[in-house]
């Protein structure tokens, strides 16, 4: 019964239903503090493409857009199934966030840094790590040094790396995590993957999550809606998994058929080649019987002298 009582709500459901409330900002702030490796204080939750609850929700993508105390924009997105051109859509979402949060007439100084965190439950591609970070830097073509930008802040010239200005992309490949959780980052990824939170966790945000994201803290109606959400994800994953298996079987069948066809074609080609070679050997033997030298036979048939000698043995 203890295990049941320690069951926790999935993070995508929490983002959609609970973490937008100011009283629950502690969970989200802890998550961002760990993944961005700096203290994060949320001052506002902004409207985003996927944060409305819609009747035709397919449970595929959930996102939340927040603004921190420095005015920077943070997008957290959870993607349950694969999507064609996923990175292109992430890029578009970041570009849209930048343009949406600068007013007409503002200078480019008002452009804010954007962090994009993607929590992925599908195989995006090949890689040995479970977290990948993408940042912009300018590297000297000949010198290989990193360009540092001079800019002005509060009448003071400061130097910045381009990565402090351009968006930062973080891809969390949840299904690739197979470690014993020791660090706060690993504890968070373990929760994202398995729904497990250690009773003695000290990871920012997870202490609050243990209290506020308990499954049995929800009402019967909320639990029913949550269970339907989980069922929808499982059904969707099963359908996609079966489609992949069927595709693989079809591919194997096509490969076998192609292999048989190629084998027949290769057999015919090899047979023809062997026939032509045997014909040349017969001609070489007849020429030798009629008194022609090995050198003359090689010149006429195109066979080497060594091949001529073999053909008459």
Which role does the model predict for each range below?
Residues 1-313:
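Elongated, amphipathic alpha-helical interaction scaffolds
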């Amino acid at each position: 019964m203890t295990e049941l009582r320690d069951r926790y709500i999935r993070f995508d459901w929490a983002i959609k239903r609970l973490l937008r409330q100011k009283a629950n900002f502690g969970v989200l702030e802890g998550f961002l503090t760990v993944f961005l490796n700096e203290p994060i204080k949320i001052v506002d939750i902004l409207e985003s493409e996927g944060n409305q609850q819609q009747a035709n929700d397919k449970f595929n993508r959930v996102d939340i857009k927040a603004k921190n105390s420095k005015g920077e924009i943070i997008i957290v997105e959870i993607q349950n199934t694969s999507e064609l051109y996923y990175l292109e859509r992430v890029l578009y979402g970041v570009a849209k966030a930048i343009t949406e949060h600068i007013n007409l007439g503002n200078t480019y100084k008002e452009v804010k840094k954007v962090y994009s965190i993607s929590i992925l439950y599908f195989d995006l591609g090949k890689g040995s790590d479970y977290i990948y970070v993408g940042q912009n830097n300018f590297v000297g073509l000949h010198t290989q040094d990193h360009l540092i930008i001079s800019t002005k802040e509060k009448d003071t010239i400061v130097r910045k790396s381009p990565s402090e200005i351009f968006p930062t992309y973080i891809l969390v490949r949840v299904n690739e995590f197979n470690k014993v959780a020791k660090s706060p980052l690993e504890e968070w990824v373990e929760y994202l993957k398995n729904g497990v939170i250690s009773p003695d966790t000290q990871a920012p945000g997870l202490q609050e999550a243990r209290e506020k994201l308990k499954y049995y803290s929800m009402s019967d109606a909320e639990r029913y809606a949550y269970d339907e959400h989980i069922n929808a994800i499982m059904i969707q994953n099963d359908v996609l998994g079966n489609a992949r298996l069927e595709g693989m079987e079809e591919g194997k069948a096509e490969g076998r058929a192609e292999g048989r066809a190629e084998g027949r074609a290769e057999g015919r080609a090899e047979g023809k080649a062997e026939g032509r070679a045997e014909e040349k050997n017969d001609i070489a033997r007849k020429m030798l019987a009629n008194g022609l030298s090995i050198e003359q036979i090689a010149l006429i048939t195109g066979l080497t002298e060594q091949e001529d000698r073999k053909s008459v043995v």
